[in-house]
Amino acid sequence: MASAEGGGDKYRSFLHGDGEKKTVWRHGAPPNYDLVNKLFEEERTKEWAEGSVEEKVQRLLKTWEMEMVHKVRPEDQKSVNLKNYSASTNGLKPLTREEVMAMGGYNAFLATTLPPEHRIYDPEAESVESATSTFLTAFPRGFAIEVLDVYSSPSAPRIAFKFRHWGYMEGPFKGHPPHGGRVEFFGVCVFHVDEDTKVEKAEFFYERGNFLASFLTAPAASASASGCPVMRGAD
């Protein structure tokens, strides 16, 4: 998540430069990750050395996420294989690139088989635009992501890693008032990559229910940490 304009970015590739002059951006300009990068740097639990396996995988993850959310045309997405790409969440049916682009990255990531009446957030009832607005409103500073561990080489056919995703609910979410507390979840991802380390298939596994439930009330740890209703941090 990011605002509409910005300078260079030290954690993501394919965001600025000559190669992006013809890129079509969803909001008309490259996103600005300054606020979320600040949160990331302040609250990350791992600081990987530049050029390390973990740093390379983290850069690929952040770049992939940026391109899926902010680049409109498939041909502008340089972190994924142009001909072969699919993504799945929690073992559900893999989605093609066209399906992901049509429904949006947020909705694809939050796919569920729960009956509609039990959904805190219903990705099937949201458009790309409404989903983006919903999460930008809830997390005005964004929702940071870091790689915690890598279980294989980034040059392998499969890259398996553990990640942490977090932010602070400082805005309303689907009618629920902001509680100012930290909202976070942990998960595991497997990137299937080609010989150029472009993602051909992305498989994410995480606890969706607990993540969304944390929008409804301040997490116990965050609530006890401060009496202030607005607490710091988000990406």
Curated annotation (Swiss-Prot):
Matches recorded under SUPFAM superfamilies: NTF2-like
Gene3D superfamilies for the chain: 3.10.450.50
One annotated GO biological process: defense response
Induction: By fungus Bipolaris sorokiniana infection.
Superkingdom to which the source organism belongs: Eukaryota
Keywords in alphabetical order: Pathogenesis-related protein, Plant defense
Protein's recorded name: Pathogen-related protein
